[in-house]
Amino acid sequence: MAKVAIVMGSDSDFDKLKGCVTKLKEFDIEVDVNVISAHRTPDEAAEFAKTAEEKGIEVIIAAAGMAAHLGGVLAAHTIVPVIGVPIKSTFDGMDSLLATVQMPPGIPVATVGVDNGTNAAILAAQMLSLKYDYLKQALKASKDKIAEGVRQKNQKIKELVKEL
């Protein structure tokens, strides 16, 4: 079974990551959730990253707000792929987004949109689908469901237009 760690900088970030946890579980991916701060517990952050691979963690999703250095700190200490989720706080999340996405060469953090843990989960599943065939089918089914929802909305709009 695939395994993903979600690391958040503060417990206050958890509400914005519930969709991430739910989506990973929908894909039957084992989830390991942690609160580790890049600034308040830097030694724990480094140790977590250094030992992630031996714990079977295959992707790390790092979520943080404000000076969102968590993803970068974790990425600096591991070869496990890190996906950053900037969390909206001050400056409408722009500070978190820039801190997460603007990494120096050699220390990549794949970054999704502000507060978009669900996309982080989907991206993690896509990465893992290269190793786990069951995820390929789950991802295809998920995209088919999204497409069907759009088709239904399209039909509804067409019917509303006829009524005008």
Predicted regions and their residues:
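Short glycine/serine/threonine-rich phosphate/pyrophosphate-binding segments
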Residues: 13-17, 41-45, 64-73, 92-94, ...
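Glycine/charged-rich beta-loop-alpha catalytic/anionic-binding loops adjacent to active sites
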Residues: 2, 29-32, 55, 79-80, ...
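Glycine-rich phosphate/pyrophosphate-binding loop and the adjoining helix
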Residues: 129-164
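Glycine-rich phosphate/diphosphate-binding loop of Rossmann-like nucleotide-binding domains
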Residues: 2-40
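Glycine-rich phosphate-binding loop
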Residues: 48-86
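N-terminal beta-loop-helix "entrance" segment that forms/cooperates
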Residues: 36-54
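Short, glycine-/small-residue-rich phosphate/pyrophosphate-handling segment
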Residues: 91-137
